[in-house]
């Protein structure tokens, strides 16, 4: 009995330590976003003596917040919509059509997840540049290419839990394959869609590397690209940078907490097979 209590206390202590380690970056960012530059360098971990709300005003002005926010939002929303639709349609075709080629194509999508982006980024950007496609539309197309592998993998697994008898009954009633997918199968895949959306929002919204390679126009830059300019080679405005990071992180945090309950439901639903 005593051994069980010791294990329980150790697990609780370990959980607290891991939670503090996970929260500490957010604490440092939030606390230092309200400090002056001198106060930040004096003691990074201390609470601010006074709340410097001007940091947020200056950061928003320097970021050109409305433009950068709208660019990031447009790219993220369109990328997720296209990834979800393309991945679910592809997975539906591969899972329902029983051919050897379907298995091979599915394996190609699965193996593609193992290819590191860094190994293809230079030739990819070079090819897109030849077609003058280094734009926001080109960036969305790239996100589709890199995000569809995970999407197909998740949807394919979810479709295994949906009986083919639904498809057969709909075909007998005169439904086309597209109507079966759109009106019957896709709504049943909502848990997987929510899971994929949460993962992709956290990836695309916070992505710096790919937009830095693709987007050249100042008016098309995303929030991560604009925040980078607070940490240039010769000037590092850490307090303004922390305020900018807080502004950029806040929408994702709000979305995650709003979608958390549905995400847990999605994970549970995805674990239950017919």
UniProtKB/Swiss-Prot annotation:
Residues 69-259 form the ABC transmembrane type-1 domain. It holds the Pfam family BPD_transp_1. The chain crosses the membrane at residues 11-31, 73-93, 103-123, 139-159, 184-204, 238-258. GO terms for biological process: transmembrane transport. Its main location: membrane. It is a multi-pass membrane protein. One of its GO terms (cellular component) is plasma membrane. The keyword Methyltransferase does not apply. Keywords: Cell membrane, Membrane, Transmembrane, Transmembrane helix, Transport. It is found in: Cell membrane. Belongs to the binding-protein-dependent transport system permease family. MalFG subfamily. Probably part of a binding-protein-dependent transport system starch degradation products. Probably responsible for the translocation of the substrate across the membrane. This is Probable starch degradation products transport system permease protein AmyC. It comes from Thermoanaerobacterium thermosulfurigenes (Clostridium thermosulfurogenes). The gene is amyC.
């Amino acid at each position: 009995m005593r051994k069980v209590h010791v294990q329980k206390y150790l697990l609780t202590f370990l959980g607290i330590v891991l939670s503090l380690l996970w929260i500490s970056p957010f604490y440092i960012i939030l606390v230092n976003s309200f400090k002056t530059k001198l106060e930040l360098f004096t003691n990074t971990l201390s609470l601010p003596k006074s709340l410097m709300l001007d940091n947020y005003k200056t950061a928003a002005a320097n970021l050109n917040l409305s433009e950068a926010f709208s660019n990031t939002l447009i790219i993220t929303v369109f990328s997720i919509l296209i990834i979800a639709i393309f991945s679910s349609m592809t997975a539906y075709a591969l899972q329902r059509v029983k051919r050897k080629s379907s298995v091979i194509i599915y394996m190609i999508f699965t193996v593609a997840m193992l290819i590191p982006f860094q190994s293809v980024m230079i030739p990819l950007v070079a090819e897109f540049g030849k077609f003058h496609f280094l734009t926001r539309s080109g960036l969305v197309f790239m996100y589709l290419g890199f995000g569809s592998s995970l999407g197909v993998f998740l949807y394919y697994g979810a479709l295994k839990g949906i009986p083919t008898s639904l498809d057969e009954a709909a075909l007998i009633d005169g439904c086309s394959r597209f109507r079966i997918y759109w009106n019957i199968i896709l709504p049943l895949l909502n848990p997987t869609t929510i899971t994929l959306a949460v993962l992709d929002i956290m990836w695309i919204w916070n992505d710096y590397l790919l937009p830095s390679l693709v987007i050249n126009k100042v008016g098309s830059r995303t929030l991560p690209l604009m925040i980078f300019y607070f940490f240039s080679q010769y000037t590092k405005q850490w307090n303004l940078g922390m305020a900018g990071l807080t502004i950029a992180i806040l929408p994702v945090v709000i979305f995650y907490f709003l979608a958390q309950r549905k995400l847990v439901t999605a994970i549970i639903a995805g674990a239950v097979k017919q």
